[in-house]
From Swiss-Prot:
Keyword match Plastid: yes
Biological classification of the source: Eukaryota, Viridiplantae, Streptophyta, Embryophyta, Marchantiophyta
Record membrane topology: Multi-pass membrane protein
Catalytic class of the enzyme: translocase
Pfam family, one: Proton_antipo_C
One MF annotation (Gene Ontology) recorded for this entry: quinone binding
Principal cellular location given in the protein's record: plastid
GO CC annotation, single: chloroplast thylakoid membrane
Transmembrane segments: 9-29, 39-59, 89-109, 120-140, 147-167, 184-204, 219-239, 258-278, 289-309, 327-347, 354-374, 395-415, 425-445, 503-523, 555-575, 643-663, 671-691
This enzyme's EC code(s): 7.1.1.-
Family affiliation: Belongs to the complex I subunit 5 family.
Protein name: NAD(P)H-quinone oxidoreductase subunit 5, chloroplastic
Gene behind the chain: ndhF
Amino acid sequence: MELIFQNVWFVPLFPFLASILLGIGLFFFPNSIKKFRRLSSFISIMFLNIAMLLSFHFFWQQITGSPIHRYLWSWVLYKNFVLEIGYLLDPLTSIMLVLVTTVAVMVMIYSDSYMFYDEGYIKFFCYLSLFTASMLGLVLSPNLIQVYIFWELVGMCSYLLIGFWFTRPSAANACQKAFVTNRIGDFGLLLGILGFYWITGSFDFQQLSKRFFELLSYNQINLVFATLCALFLFLGPVAKSAQFPLHIWLPDAMEGPTPISALIHAATMVAAGIFLVARMFPLFQMLPFVMSIISWTGAITALLGATIALAQKDLKKGLAYSTMSQLGYMMLALGIGSYKAGLFHLITHAYSKALLFLGSGSVIHSMEPIVGYHPNKSQNMIFMGGLRQYMPITAITFLFGTLSLCGIPPFACFWSKDEILVNSWLHFPILGSIAFFTAGLTAFYMFRIYFLTFEGDFRGHFFDDVKKLSSISIWGSLEFNKEQFKLDKKSTLYPKEANNIMLFPLIILTIPTVFIGFIGILFDENKMNVDSLSYWLTLSINSFNYSNSEKFLEFLFNAIPSVSIAFFGILIAFYLYGPNFSFLKKEKKKLQLKSEIDIVLKSFSNFIYNWSYYRAYIDGFYSSFFIKGLRFLIKIVSFIDRWIIDGIINGIGIFSFFGGESLKYIEGGRISSYLFFIIFCMFLFFLYSYII
């Protein structure tokens, strides 16, 4: 058994080997390997399945009482400086290993069909395997330096995958935007790592917290400097997990293939920031100001993401802002000290959002032959509608993911989100109010997405009639006269259900979307009076002082407010976007008669629409203030460099040149001329002196 634990590094090694094999094949045999497309995906999936089985084995060993395993090797030795690499296996690590590998396997199986006809099919699996290996290496890292190395590898793979279709300008711009934004966070992370090494003399997670606590106990730490280092370190997770104000890259990252959105932007890369904050949680707890910044950053991000998602027309971008909002919930939980609730929501959200993204990919895949392959058409919810009758399995699984994200029992996200809501209210009512209000918005925009996509009448055949489609408001007025659209008789294309290879991951992911939430709930009293997840996390290196878990019935009773708010949001979405039953039509006509109310609602809806369309005006502000301001500053610097600095140097050179040319004619080589010149100058000097 000990031999198996000494070889934990096999988990990231297998997907890394798959990436290396496909990369070598593409480099040396580019034409031959394209004939073995299925074999390439089989290698990637098989190797990742081995890593997944190993992850489940390590997870089972950890939760059944196996001690924490930590293996280190000396990497750099210089005098008293020792830099070690290795791996750390505790319950938190094992949970993340299972999470990453299970979602990655489902995404790879799904991609086998989704990307099969793409020219970069093998390259896609090569990048995907490398990304998975990098994320697994990050999870296993025992110190900050190793985390930083894999952190950068994850960022590099994200850049490659977001810009996978780089010939499309929007995709090329999106991957550059993600890269530059994350560089800001990564620079802060590096400064924070170096700062804490300056304070404690260690990069190791366990030693770092222990030494920091000892120094803090003896008042040997400058709290201002320590707080500054912690905020710099927190800047890395802010960028990686798309927290305000470095969230702007996430919606544009939807330009990548949809399976990438399910893997990177649901369960892995964006979760890396949450994981790092959880790893550094014992240290952050000693700095109350930093914890306050973390909690408020999470709350603002949750609310901002929800408000921007309210009127999105792009299916994937709506889910992207939803991801941003839910990541804000996780950060809020960690900031208020609710360690278990934050990680609990990380787990439940990962499976639910992966299901939603893969479901959106199935929808987009079926819409592309009808409306075209450009994202502005195939991902536009205005051209969808009524897909439930054509894609019933996709619709049901998407509905399950929607119900989970809205916090409806007994789906997974209900248990974790409600715990965050209650804890945030108890910690500080203002934070709790923001969290509860955001929960209502989440229910509204998620069912808005569902109704626009799967309910009503199919609108895909009207995509080329711009004038008539412009009359279809995205704010609920989706009734239109079918007779006013004259369909071409040749137009017989309708969406089709995805094939079995794409449906298999959707069905499998439905299982954790429904049941994974039960790991955080106490159904019957045990000796420790604690739920399974809390017990597992107490065995981790980041053990925390948990309070007794609420009993099942008590938990449900406390969840009544959050569920009520969620149902209220669903009812509003149903009223605006749901099937147009006769009684709803009558109610809408009654409201239309009240002109004052109608004007107020219309002005409010226009404000919300503009807020969502212009992304809360944040992107425009960054573009005007930073990008245009930086370009203007560069022009000024360029002008100074060219005309002042270079002008002085060039002026001296020109003056020397013409001075030399002038003296060239005076110097004739005759001594009599030199004597005459000297005497003449002396005469002028004495004459000047005499006059003065």
